[in-house]
UniProtKB/Swiss-Prot annotation:
Lineage: Bacteria, Pseudomonadati, Pseudomonadota, Gammaproteobacteria, Moraxellales
Protein name, entry field: DNA replication and repair protein RecF
GO biological process: DNA replication; DNA synthesis involved in DNA repair; double-strand break repair; SOS response
Regions that span the bilayer: none
Main location: cytoplasm
Binding annotation for ATP: 30-37
Native species: Acinetobacter baylyi (strain ATCC 33305 / BD413 / ADP1)
Keyword ATP-binding among UniProt keywords: yes
Length: 358
């Protein structure tokens, strides 16, 4: 979905924002605190139902307001969200109310590229698992269904483990069966997807870090050689003792291996940032190969990447057909790259919450 029109109301310090004629690349510049990042935050809210800055709606909904509204339109779709202080939300697609955020997310695949962040590499398995599941959601039609059933079974099993200190295998058997069935399904889907992803990853890695060999390895979160059912039986007593489910796809990881060891241990901060870019760009490329285009949020592009890296990133995103929303303090550096690559763009000045096309 390529956004042609964007309306934002009551998000942080932004005045009512009404943008039309959006281009493949849209650059928002202005002083720190002017509201640039809040525009990206609003688009992120619309696509995912979450802010990338806070979990608390009261922090991004304007003071004394009860809600925030974000609306976007493409040539063929109209999507909108009303987010309430309570965290509840109302979602509409082409005027019809829809039940789940997933329906909206399917229409608006979105990646947030933060050049200052190395969380995917440094902060344990969870952000890497979330990265993998973003890809799964968009390329594997049955993933969301399997994940929903697996998550419900896991929640029920963990509740039992927490409420009873003594549990027999028979008491857990219904949940073990459900976990095993849908967990193995998730594992099979992830295994196939990661194998496909590896080729895309190596292509983007070669462009951004040509002197490094890094392998992407999938760890399923359980002993796949014996199967999840057997793990649940073998570790029954330990699960009862710990009062949670130790093994399963909810503990999966993506391991990034170099010849010298794990990437988080041996790479410099600059290399980690480029590795993070390669991971996300390769996912965007994989969607592009399936005729799905990704909206990309690029916050503070010029702050952490040198000029060559900026140009390579912009060129690659253009090749992948992405619509890109960029914030920067140095718009001249960004427009110089875009002009040099003959890429269409629109420039916006953001000043004290007011957004004006330049």
């Amino acid at each position: 979905m390529q956004i042609t029109r964007l309306n934002i109301e009551r998000v942080r310090n932004l005045k009512a924002v009404a943008l039309s004629g959006l281009q493949p690349f849209n650059i928002f510049y202005g002083a720190n605190g002017s509201g640039k990042t809040s525009i990206l935050e609003a688009v992120h809210l619309l696509a995912t139902g979450r802010s990338f800055r806070t979990h608390m709606p009261k922090h991004y909904i304007q003071q004394n307001a009860q809600d925030a509204i974000i609306f976007a339109q493409s040539l063929s779709e109209k999507i909108g969200m009303q987010k309430l202080l309570s965290g509840e939300q109302l979602i509409k697609v082409n005027g019809d109310t829809v039940a789940t955020q997933g329906q909206l997310a399917k229409l608006l695949p979105l990646q947030h590229l933060d050049p200052q962040s190395t969380d995917i590499i440094d902060h344990g398995a969870k952000p890497r698992r979330q990265l993998l599941d973003w890809l799964m959601f968009h390329v594997e039609p049955e993933f969301y269904f399997a994940w929903q059933y697996y998550s419900r079974a896991l929640k029920q099993r963990n509740m039992l483990l927490k409420t009873k200190r003594q549990l027999s295998l028979a008491e857990l058997e219904p949940w073990n069966k459900m976990l095993s069935e849908y967990g193995e399904m998730l594992h099979s889907q992830r295994l196939v997807t990661v194998e496909r992803w590896k080729d895309f990853f190596q292509q983007d890695l070669a462009q951004l870090l040509p002197d490094l060999q890094i392998e992407l390895e999938y760890s399923p979160g359980f002993h796949s050689e014996v199967g999840l059912w057997q793990d649940l039986l073998n570790y029954h007593n330990k699960d009862v003792e710990r009062r949670y489910t130790e093994y399963g796809p909810h503990r999966a990881d993506l391991r990034l291996k170099t010849a010298l060891g794990d990437a988080d241990d041996v790479l410099s901060r600059g290399q980690k940032k480029l590795l993070m870019m390669a991971l996300k760009l390769s996912q965007i490329a994989m969607l592009h190969a399936s005729n799905k285009e990704t909206v990309v949020l690029l916050d503070d592009l010029t702050a952490e990447l040198d000029s060559n890296a900026q140009r390579r990133l912009i060129e690659r995103l253009s090749q992948l057909g992405s619509q890109v929303f960029i914030t920067t303090l140095d718009h001249q550096a960004v427009t110089q790259h875009l002009d040099g690559l003959s890429i269409s763009y629109q420039l916006y000045n953001v000043d004290h919450g007011q957004v004006h096309a330049v």
